[in-house]
């Protein structure tokens, strides 16, 4: 099973298939990442691979983090991520994880922080229908009733209301890998990916119940 990789979203573009149809794609600079730690059952209670991505300035790294990162290489890394594995014997501290771990035609799950849209109303945040815009109506973009009076006499927790929209960690599943450029560390996937250009994303094999992760389907 292939472990995941960290990368940076570059933006969106389009490719054309054999029939001339435009296919929307997202370009991701995936890795290279460095293995910074191997976790084992004996020491940690579980087996996992920790990788790092993105060079950081020394002033932004604490002394404990600096000591931890220098064990695997000379560069100080900004982003760390763990992936559970069954065995760590095939990895060594300092190994490079690149886009070669993935294949064209493979499906992946990509996680990232969605674009923040600030405080938004009911229509924009939840897709509510608006009220009449004329004929004396004063209920244009108002929410309508939020709860009854005597019973229950309150608004239930989780009621969809206006509030901060976006800026949350979300995952888009089952994205198809269309192209890989290992010279430029580029991964081209079909469809959109969470976040804005320049944001960090986590790419891992598609997790399908009943199948091993990363299998072609």
UniProtKB/Swiss-Prot annotation:
GO terms under cellular component: cytosolic large ribosomal subunit
Keyword entries, A-Z: Ribonucleoprotein, Ribosomal protein, RNA-binding, rRNA-binding
Region (Disordered): 129-162
The keyword RNA-binding is annotated on this UniProt entry: yes
Pfam family, one: Ribosomal_L3
Compositional bias per record (Low complexity), positions renumbered to this chain: 142-153
GO biological-process terms attached to the record: translation
GO molecular function, one term: structural constituent of ribosome
Assembly notes: Part of the 50S ribosomal subunit. Forms a cluster with proteins L14 and L19.
Task performed by this protein: One of the primary rRNA binding proteins, it binds directly near the 3'-end of the 23S rRNA, where it nucleates assembly of the 50S subunit.
Family: Belongs to the universal ribosomal protein uL3 family.
Name this protein carries in UniProt: Large ribosomal subunit protein uL3
Native source organism of the sequence: Prochlorococcus marinus (strain MIT 9215)
């Amino acid at each position: 099973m292939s472990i995941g990789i960290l990368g940076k979203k570059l933006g969106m573009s389009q490719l054309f298939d054999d029939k001339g149809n435009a296919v929307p794609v997202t370009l991701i600079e995936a890795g290279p990442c460095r293995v910074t730690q191997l976790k084992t059952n004996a020491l940690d209670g579980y087996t996992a691979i920790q990788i790092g991505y993105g060079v950081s300035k020394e002033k932004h790294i604490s002394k404990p983090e600096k000591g931890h990162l220098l064990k695997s290489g000379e560069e100080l890394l900004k982003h760390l991520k763990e992936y559970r594995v069954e065995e760590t014997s095939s990895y060594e501290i300092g190994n490079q994880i690149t886009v070669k771990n993935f294949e064209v035609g493979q499906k992946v799950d990509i996680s990232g922080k969605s674009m923040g849209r600030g405080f938004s109303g009911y229509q924009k945040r939840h897709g509510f229908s608006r009220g009449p815009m004329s004929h004396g109506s004063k209920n244009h973009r108002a929410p309508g009733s939020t709860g009854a009076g005597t019973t229950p006499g309150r608004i239930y927790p989780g009621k969809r209301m206006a509030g901060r929209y976006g800026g949350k960690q979300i995952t888009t599943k089952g994205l198809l890998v269309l192209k890989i450029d290992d010279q430029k560390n580029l991964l081209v996937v079909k469809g959109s990916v969470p976040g804005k250009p320049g944001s960090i994303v986590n790419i891992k094999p598609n997790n399908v119940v009943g199948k091993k992760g990363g299998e072609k389907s």
